[in-house]
Amino acid sequence: MAPNLRKSHPLLKMVNNSLIDLPTPSNISAWWNFGSLLGICLATQILTGLLLAAHYTADTTLAFSSVAHTCRNVQHGWLIRNLHANGASFFFICIYLHIGRGLYYGSYLYKETWNTGVILLLTLMATAFVGYVLPWGQMSFWGATVITNLFSAVPYIGQTLVEWAWGGFSVDNPTLTRFFTLHFLLPFMIMGLTLIHLTFLHESGSNNPLGIVSNCDKIPFHPYFSLKDILGFMLMLLPLMTLALFSPNLLGDPENFPPANPLVTPPYIKPEWYFLFAYAILRSIPNKLGGVLALAASVLILFLAPLLHKSKQRTMTFRPLSQLLFWTLTANLLILTWVGSQPVEHPFMIIGQLASLTYFTILLVLFPITGALENKMLNY
């Protein structure tokens, strides 16, 4: 009998072991769909990004016009641009839900998979930031100025660091050129990191909603979860297309419609919605260095999740106290996102400071204490 090519061919064998014959826990819920949705987001962003890059000119005098030209004169250029801009929003929606799932179900106990995931998040944030600068609108220019300026808070080498990043004494042509280079390069880095992320995941196998070893009850990935993933793709691509076709500027900032003008400061400077929670944490501390450290800590704190797990149970499925904390944290992040979009005045300042304090308190103090308390309660 001839050998099955799918199982014997060196390349097809890898695909088979990752996507077809992969043993998967039978009880994973729709929360496990977001990994594959992130894969689709990445593929969509790279495809639309390549098509946009073909018509883009990384020069301060031409960047804005080249984007306008793409939207007006290139076949379906408007659609490609709208899909790319709104695809970024969907990318972040999926990654935040994916991280939330990981925190709720204790997936962070697969330390290597979790750590590569956090590195992926940081890379994605960097990619989105440099990408936002490329259309060279007002908010692109001033956003780049404000955020790169944060590096000047680094003691001793800060100012040198900023000028090195800018390629001059202000955000100008060299900055735009290098940001375009980075925006082109980073998605391919994300692809590489994704493969590492999956390699680590397939070493241990997927977690499941009960958080128990499921080796005795696994089913092949195909056709069960491949079909479930395709349903997920359709359910995500439908709202993405709806947003891109009917309301493409809903999530954008109207301040980015005028071309960049270094002589006119916009009335407010704020990032895209997916960075607002971190921006609110940055603004809540009146000291520049303190704000930058809090901003960095707001994301880097995820690296500590495995160390702060004190419960004997892996998931929060049967831990009502931890569940209450988790949903409080979720509400807290939504409050931070809202505060980040508001002007720096009373009462938003104090709300932002309280929400920032709550964010760190829940993650660093209350989660471990609650885990230990629930262990005690199990003994009674």
From Swiss-Prot:
It holds the Pfam family Cytochrome_B. GO terms for cellular component: mitochondrial inner membrane; respiratory chain complex III. One of its GO terms (biological process) is mitochondrial electron transport, ubiquinol to cytochrome c. It is found in: Mitochondrion inner membrane. A ubiquinone binds at residue 202. Its main location: mitochondrion. GO terms for molecular function: metal ion binding; ubiquinol-cytochrome-c reductase activity. Binds 2 heme b groups non-covalently. Heme b b562 binds at residues 84, 183. Its cofactor is heme b. Keywords: Electron transport, Heme, Iron, Membrane, Metal-binding, Mitochondrion, Mitochondrion inner membrane, Respiratory chain, Transmembrane, Transmembrane helix, Transport, Ubiquinone. InterPro entries: Cyt_b/b6_C (IPR005798), Cyt_b/b6_C_sf (IPR036150), Cyt_b/b6_N (IPR005797), Cytb/b6-like_sf (IPR027387), Cytochrome_b (IPR030689), Cytochrome_b_C_euk/bac (IPR048260), Cytochrome_b_N_euk/bac (IPR048259), Di-haem_cyt_TM (IPR016174). It comes from the Eukaryota. Belongs to the cytochrome b family. The cytochrome bc1 complex contains 11 subunits: 3 respiratory subunits (MT-CYB, CYC1 and UQCRFS1), 2 core proteins (UQCRC1 and UQCRC2) and 6 low-molecular weight proteins (UQCRH/QCR6, UQCRB/QCR7, UQCRQ/QCR8, UQCR10/QCR9, UQCR11/QCR10 and a cleavage product of UQCRFS1). This cytochrome bc1 complex then forms a dimer. Heme 1 (or BL or b562) is low-potential and absorbs at about 562 nm, and heme 2 (or BH or b566) is high-potential and absorbs at about 566 nm. Component of the ubiquinol-cytochrome c reductase complex (complex III or cytochrome b-c1 complex) that is part of the mitochondrial respiratory chain. The b-c1 complex mediates electron transfer from ubiquinol to cytochrome c. Contributes to the generation of a proton gradient across the mitochondrial membrane that is then used for ATP synthesis. This is Cytochrome b.
